[in-house]
Amino acid sequence: MKKGRAKKLLGICIFLMGLMIFSVLPVQAATPRMYTIQPGKTWTRYDITGDGKKDRIKVVRRKSQYDGCWNGADIYVNNTKVCAINKTFMDMSIRIITLSNGKPFLCLRGGTDNDISVFHGLYQYRNGKIVQVVNFINETYGRPVNEAKIYLSGNTIRVRTEAMSYSLGYCTTEFTYKYQKGTLLRTSNYGKYIKLNAANKRTGLFAAAKNIQAYTTPTSGSKAFVIRKNTGVKILNFWTTGNKMYIRVKNGSKTGWIKAVTFKESQGYAGSPQFSRVMYTG
């Protein structure tokens, strides 16, 4: 009897110790995932509403009278229409993103001739609708092209997009978004230039096509110095919010900010008015 009681007591002790060890172990976050789905088919393997249950997802493109074009697209979740995209496009990409915390998002893009994006961003299911929460497109300062490259880490997303900048020509930029306050928010108004195709291949510099005013910060309006025509300019990074955009530059030993060029200021598609030999081509 004593041996039986001892074994029972030992078993209880081991069980309690196991519970204690388990309770202090850190909870391992799930690995974030990204899946590509195709329009015209019903998908039943993914949660898009955020309730942890698999949903029925279908994206239906609207036919156009023109070959190779679509008049828009409708998104259905569990047989209910939850989103209408009213843009004409030729090709469409759909990606489902699930963060480490289980929160799902859609990355949608529609493209036309020359890979120009007409809609491109992150979408989230809210109150029975799928709505855009991040817009990758800013047509004020450039023509957006190609599909974004997305890098996942926990509840953070790094997004690299390509555009034909009216200041700098073909470039790749990067922003970081983090899950906060129930959605994905950009972590900073400062973005990175990953690639600048029009920069001098040997020096990495741009040549000023005219005198350009530089400012001390992107918000103060305080003048710093003037970049002289034909001098070399190194592009560092950029700042943007709303419809404002400034580019951080280095000219000799001086660093400052210049206003980015808009489409109207670019004189159509003639080339950048700020820098020499910058054409709006791939």
Q: What residue spans do the PLM features occupy?
A:
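SH3-family beta-barrel domains
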Residues: 183-216, 262-282
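Sec-dependent signal peptide cleavage junction
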Residues: 21-33
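A short beta-strand motif characteristic of beta-propeller blades
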Residues: 33-34, 81-87, 134
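SH3/SH3-like beta-barrel superfamily modules
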Residues: 226-278
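Acidic carboxylate motifs that coordinate Ca2+ or other divalent cations, activating on Asp/Glu
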Residues: 51
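Short aromatic loop motif centered on NTY/YTY
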Residues: 91-124, 129-204
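Bacterial N-terminal signal peptides
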Residues: 12-23
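Bacterial N-terminal signal peptides that target proteins for export
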Residues: 2-13
